[in-house]
């Protein structure tokens, strides 16, 4: 997927849902853990050299798996490229758990599925589709393959 560099740079400067200095190792063979400022903005994970304002890279958190590797470490790999694994090390076990949860919940697909779950719960309780008032209940992006509304 192609991205406009200026748009990504602008997005990287927005308020982060989560940010911290983490040790990070890229997917290339022989790469080593390096301290990076890591920022989660919407469904992008930006990483920066410490004390630099422009990101050196970004990961779109779609079609990927976030896995806890050990007490303080987690990884991100993409479903269509499982051999490409990004490794991260946190300063504590608690920080690691927080990052894994935040990254797992950041994808558009997770948010869409959450919306569908709560939409169905409201429909069961009230008998009304909460998206109808916005005129968007029939849009394909709000449909699950096996959902029956």
From Swiss-Prot:
SUPFAM superfamilies: PH domain-like. Residues 15-108 form the PH domain. It holds the Pfam family PH. Signal peptide: none annotated. SMART domains: PH. Transmembrane segments: none annotated. PROSITE patterns: PH_DOMAIN. InterPro entries: Boi1/Boi2-like, PH-like_dom_sf, PH_domain. This is Pleckstrin homology domain-containing family J member 1. The gene is plekhj1.
């Amino acid at each position: 997927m192609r991205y406009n560099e200026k748009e990504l740079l602008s997005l990287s400067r927005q308020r982060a849902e989560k940010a911290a200095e983490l040790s990070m190792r890229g997917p290339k063979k022989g790469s080593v853990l390096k301290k990076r400022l890591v920022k989660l903005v919407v469904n992008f994970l930006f990483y920066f050299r410490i004390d630099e304002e422009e990101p050196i890279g970004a990961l779109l958190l779609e079609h990927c798996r976030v896995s806890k590797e050990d007490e303080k470490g987690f990884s991100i790999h993409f479903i269509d490229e499982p051999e490409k694994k990004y490794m991260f090390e946190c300063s504590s076990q608690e920080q690691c758990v927080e990052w894994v949860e935040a990254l797992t919940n950041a994808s558009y697909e997770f948010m869409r599925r959450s919306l569908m779950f709560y939409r169905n719960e409201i429909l069961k309780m009230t008998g009304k589709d909460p998206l109808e008032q916005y005129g968007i209940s029939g849009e394909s992006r709000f449909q699950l393959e096996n959902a029956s509304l």
